[in-house]
């Protein structure tokens, strides 16, 4: 499955069921650009098992504030609508895969 871009208005609907890794990012953020291809790979690897979502913090400040996102990229794993894990900064694919795996 492809990465899904979410907004303040549809965020809650998109995280309600299953395992969802949300990338809180911005267009001007260098590490956010570096992690994008890693997330694309994970979206393919976990197709049908977990969803990869992206939320632009500049366009959607309410959701970023709700989850206290202070630095980007911040990646939060939601399971059935609840935040269960959080990592901040660029992460190699293996690290993110481990984070996803422990919540499947």
From Swiss-Prot:
Any Gene Ontology CC annotation: cytosol
Domain Thioredoxin: 2-104
Family annotation (Gene3D superfamilies): Glutaredoxin (3.40.30.10)
Keywords: Disulfide bond, Electron transport, Redox-active center, Transport
BP term (GO), one: cell redox homeostasis
Pfam family for this entry, one: Thioredoxin
Xref: PROSITE patterns: THIOREDOXIN_1 (PS00194), THIOREDOXIN_2 (PS51352)
Keyword rRNA processing: no
Protein name: Thioredoxin
Lineage: Bacteria, Bacillati, Bacillota, Bacilli, Bacillales
Gene: trxA
């Amino acid at each position: 499955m492809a990465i899904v871009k979410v907004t303040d208005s549809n965020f809650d609907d998109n995280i309600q069921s299953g395992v969802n890794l949300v990338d809180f990012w911005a267009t001007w953020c260098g590490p956010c650009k570096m992690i994008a291809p890693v997330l694309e790979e994970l979206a393919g690897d976990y197709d049908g098992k977990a969803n990869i979502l992206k939320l632009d913090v500049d366009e959607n400040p309410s959701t970023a504030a709700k989850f206290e996102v202070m630095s980007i990229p911040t990646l939060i794993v939601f399971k059935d609508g609840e935040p269960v894990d959080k990592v901040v900064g660029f992460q190699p694919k293996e690290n993110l895969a481990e984070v996803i795996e422990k919540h499947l």
